[in-house]
Amino acid sequence: MEGTDLLLAGVLFLFAAVVAVPLAARLGIGAVLGYLLAGIAIGPWGLGFISDVDEILHFSELGVVFLMFIIGLELNPAKLWQLRRSIFGVGAAQVLFSAVILGGLLMLTQFKWQAAVIGGIGLAMSSTAMALQLMRDKGMNRNESGQLGFSVLLFQDLAVIPALALVPLLAGSGDDHFDWMKVGMKVLAFVGMLIGGRYLLRPVFRFIAASGVREVFTAATLLLVLGSALFMDALGLSMALGTFIAGILLAESEYRHELEIAIDPFKGLLLGLFFISVGMALNLGVLYTHLLWVVVSVAVLVAVKTGVLYTLARIYGLRSSERMQFAGVLSQGGEFAFVLFSTAASQRLFQDDQMALLLVTVTLSMMTTPLLMKLIDKLLSRRFNQPDDEDEAPWVEDDKPQVIVVGFGRFGQVIGRLLMANKMRITVLERDISAVNLMRKYGYKVYYGDATQLELLRSAGAEAAESIIITCNEPEDTMKLVELCQQHFPHLHILARARGRVEAHELLQAGVTNFSRETFSSALELGRKALVSLGMHPHQAQRAQMHFRRLDMRMLRELMPVHSDTAQISRVREARRELEEIFQREMQQERRQFDGWDEFE
């Protein structure tokens, strides 16, 4: 693809994403499905703007590569050892049982047994990119079903190596066509990467960090990710697996958080590119020609994988509600099928349109997953949000909530317990199923679902409540809820959690003045204790804390309309000088009046 064509493709990708994803979000079908539909629209079977799908699809796998690197950073060898039962137990069982069932069904549809084996293995894999994105959207990454889902995906990535090695064996039906020397070299290169990464990465990043140039650190991070991916690709292995291992090797290093920050902006955009490319790869010609076969195949694929996953989750001990989410989120075919089926086709394992039919089935199964998850959400909402006639009478006469608490993580739990202890009537909205189950046991009135949906807010009693406390993890959800409440429930007194100064500015601009930055108060309190431990009188430390809080809040309001970095830095320096002057005056006053507490305490 030439430079001009590549630039045009980039513009088309961005345009399609900007148009399709907001429309999909407004329709409630999710960003992932929006990306897929955008890909169909601009691909060879849509408007035909882009025809070189294979090259773009290979490039777009970088989105999955960046995602797996960040996941690797969040783990460490000790955590992986803890997950060994779920990785090599549930993960291996899922691939084995799904591959056997699906491969057997393919043999019934006139696939040769060799093609059926490869087809079964490829269809048994799930989409790492889609599943992880949906798990994050649904809050599953905070509960056991999310950890189990990640374990299954990790085993599937590990299964890439033997699956690809199996293709030439099946194609040649003997050892004559199989180069054991080449396989041995690949294994040695892989082991060399592990050993080299273990002993070289930290010193290299220590040397780069010592330069103090942030751009060089970002460049080194990109070099590591892309280099690992290229190395694994040259070995004929999974690029995502290579970057995942690189992430694990750096998971316990002091540079972990800095690496996450450097990579994060690229991850989201490239993931979107991947989903658009998958949509472009959908062969609508094959779909039209074999419509009935494809529809039945998609239904069977999703049903078989859902059944296998649900059964394994039950054996593992997940609750029924978590089983449904776990089975649904991994029910689709995955991106690895594109690689495996292409390799098999190059070895002439497939006949006629067999490969095209399998790829269309995989692509359409990926498009069904967001819809299936919405259906599961509705079923769970019905189960958890309808009144239970067998419940005991509430301990307050008026059943209408005074306060709605959105999100019941560590931040929301403290607020909820304080309100309950003071006999306030609260209703909690939470999308983590395990948290909903737990809270109901302890007598909380909880609604399961996405609080940014207007109907859920109505069901929770927003029209009768006095206040709403928003403690969402994602700032986007917080701002969407603020807008929703201001538009439909203007009487509600809005209180919100801000993760930092940027979110605080956004809340102020939206007219929300009652917010709390999640680490600010606790950091101030610890700072006060530090001053006391260093010999400062408790009275003086308390006043220092008070002045700092007051000045910081004033700065927050003053800097809200300022967008220039230079202007912000200048204002921060002025504020620091002002704070020093206040502390100097306070010290002089304390020398004159050392004891006693004033009206501010």
Curated annotation (Swiss-Prot):
Residues 400-518 form the RCK N-terminal domain. The chain crosses the membrane at residues 5-25, 29-49, 55-75, 87-107, 115-135, 152-172, 177-197, 207-227, 230-250, 261-281, 284-304, 326-346, 356-376. InterPro entries: Cation/H_exchanger_TM, K/H_exchanger, K_H_efflux_KefB, Na+/solute_symporter_sf, NAD(P)-bd_dom_sf, RCK_N. GO terms for biological process: proton transmembrane transport. GO terms for cellular component: plasma membrane. Keywords: Antiport, Cell inner membrane, Cell membrane, Ion transport, Membrane, Potassium, Potassium transport, Transmembrane, Transmembrane helix, Transport. It comes from the Bacteria. SUPFAM superfamilies: NAD(P)-binding Rossmann-fold domains. Coiled coil: none annotated. It is found in: Cell inner membrane. HAMAP family: K_H_efflux_KefB. Pore-forming subunit of a potassium efflux system that confers protection against electrophiles. Catalyzes K(+)/H(+) antiport. Interacts with the regulatory subunit KefG. Belongs to the monovalent cation:proton antiporter 2 (CPA2) transporter (TC 2.A.37) family. KefB subfamily. This is Glutathione-regulated potassium-efflux system protein KefB.
